[in-house]
């Protein structure tokens, strides 16, 4: 089989988080040009994108990092809608330069069960889409969970699909040059001692990812 690459488009790369509903079309278009070249050379992709400035303001306003009551359901609806809208914008941008993106609504194929992501379709379905020369694309989303609703981040999906599909590479695209330590220096090699404990992180992302 062709080389499979799972790639995450970080929310901070595809949007400006300081401006709600901002979309960096030029950045996505430039990335698409590179992907198109690699696709024509035989590489195959699964794309996953974050919520960026589309989902985060709503998720924060409605406290969707933890589902508690009925009043949050409007937030669930709005967050799901804007994420689908962002996915559509990315799809249209990439399709305009020749990439056959096949968007999948994450909330329709994933749930959170026992605190962990649970894929409702077999990974074979994703592979069949790839074999038909399309590029499946998922995104961080609000999904059904044991408690009602929870947010599954793009990072959660990357980890789950990476363990299921064993790609040749998993790539995370962000607006910073790499994984940074507490002083802002790039961590060239990850070890147990260099992994940041969440207790030491002062700015936790409300959706669990970017």
Named regions from a protein language model:
Residues 1-46:
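N-terminal glycine-/serine-/threonine-rich phosphate-binding loop
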Residues 6-10, 48-49, 104-105, 137-139, ...:
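Short beta-strand segments
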Residues 13-15, 52-56, 109-112, 143-145, ...:
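Short, active-site-adjacent cap segments at secondary-structure transitions
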Residues 27, 31, 77-91, 149-151, ...:
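Polyanion-binding loop/helix "lid" in catalytic or ligand-binding cores
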Residues 29, 117-128, 144, 150-161:
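Active-site glycine-rich loop that binds ribose-phosphate moieties when present
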Residues 57-68, 185-196:
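Short, flexible, mixed-charge acidic loops at enzyme active sites
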Residues 61-141:
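Ligand-binding beta-strand-loop-alpha-helix segment within the catalytic cores
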Residues 163-189:
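Acidic, metal-binding active-site segment of PIN/NYN-like and related structure-specific nucleases
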């Amino acid at each position: 089989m062709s080389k499979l690459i799972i790639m995450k488009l970080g929310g901070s790369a595809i949007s400006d988080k300081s401006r709600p509903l901002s979309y960096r079309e030029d950045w996505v278009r430039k990335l698409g040009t590179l992907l198109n070249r690699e696709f024509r050379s035989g590489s195959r992709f699964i794309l996953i994108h974050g919520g960026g400035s589309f989902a985060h303001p709503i998720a924060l306003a409605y406290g969707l990092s933890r589902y508690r009551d009925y009043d949050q359901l409007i937030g669930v609806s709005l967050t799901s809608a804007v994420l689908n809208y962002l996915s559509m914008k990315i799809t249209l941008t990439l399709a305009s330069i020749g990439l056959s993106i096949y968007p999948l609504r994450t909330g329709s194929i994933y749930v959170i069960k026992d605190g962990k992501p649970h894929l409702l379709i077999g990974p074979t379905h994703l592979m069949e889409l790839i074999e038909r020369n399309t590029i499946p694309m998922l995104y961080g989303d609000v999904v059904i969970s044991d408690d009602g609703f929870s947010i599954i981040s793009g990072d959660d999906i990357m980890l789950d699909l990476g363990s299921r599909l064993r790609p040749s590479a998993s790539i995370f695209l962000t607006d910073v040059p790499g994984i940074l330590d507490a002083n802002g220096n790039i961590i060239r090699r990850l070890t147990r001692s260099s992994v940041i404990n969440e207790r030491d992180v002062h700015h936790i992302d409300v959706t669990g990812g970017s």
